[in-house]
Amino acid sequence: MAAKISFYKRFLLIVIFFILIFSGCSSMVYKSAFPTLSDGKYDSEFPYKGSSEELERIGESVERINCIAFYKTYVFNSGTDVKISDITEEFLEKNVNNVSYFDKTSSGTGTIIYSLNNKIALLTCAHVISFPDTIYSHFTDEKGKFTKYLESISIRDRQMIYVAGLPYGGEVELLAIDNEHDLAVLGHTYPSLQDLNFPVFPYPKGEAKQLEWGTFVYVFGYPMNYKMVSKAIVSSPNMDGHGSFLIDAVVNKGFSGGIVLGIRDGIPNFEFVGIIRSIPEESEYVLEPEKLKGNINYSSVVPYKGDVYAIEKEDLKYGIAKVIPIDVIEEFLNANKEKLSDLGYDIDKFF
């Protein structure tokens, strides 16, 4: 019996010995293959291990934002010579030729940065939820140049912001906005829902000024209303002295406001380094026929003889996107700390 116990002890010691040897070799191979993963900097190489679980968790805090603005349009007859300075509520009631209505929509991405005391707050870009209060349309002269006389004036009547997936239809309010830096915080209070808990972005804020040429990042967004994650490389780090940078992600409309994540010393060390601001674009005017009712298509063999309209078309320049750095985001939140506090939000608990 004693001999049998002694055999098992020797066997166990041998197993432990080989485990230590192989773990040591594994560590040496790891350090040899990824020598810079412990340098305290943001990684520039593709992650050495899977990150699907972490990215899925992060994605739970990323939401689609939809915004719609409703306008009332007053149309004037040619020759009435109405100028902007003439416009008053009383003038519109007396001199308008006819009234019509239309709406403008936009969509983008927001990230949940706060969920406490039945309140929720999301960070996004200001342009996602911003529409002009008034839109002017001017008559043209015989040379096609715009005159000072108004053809119509469209006044924004109301605006609604929705976050897909939130309770009660997902309507939220604008809590704070900075149009210059293109930042906004949206939120809502759910007094009837006790112990409400939304998935807040689960990783720490980073330092965008520490990003370098070639730093690897992940980005989240909602192009074409689909949640997507993509990868990108940083260029022009800290190009304005405030931490702003460019990425080469192929992003589409709907990515605005989407988070950009750096990785410091390997998975799962994600850090929030910014949000996507804009995609460069150029616009041009193209001629289009009048739209038929029911979206019926015109015949390609019958010559068109109807009215032609000049429509402005946008041409997106894919493969380059501007990013608002976390440094600017923190300045924005601190500047609105008192306002947010009055609304019941504690920015020290954001993120």
Model-derived features: positions:
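Catalytic-histidine neighborhood of serine endopeptidases
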Residues: 113-178
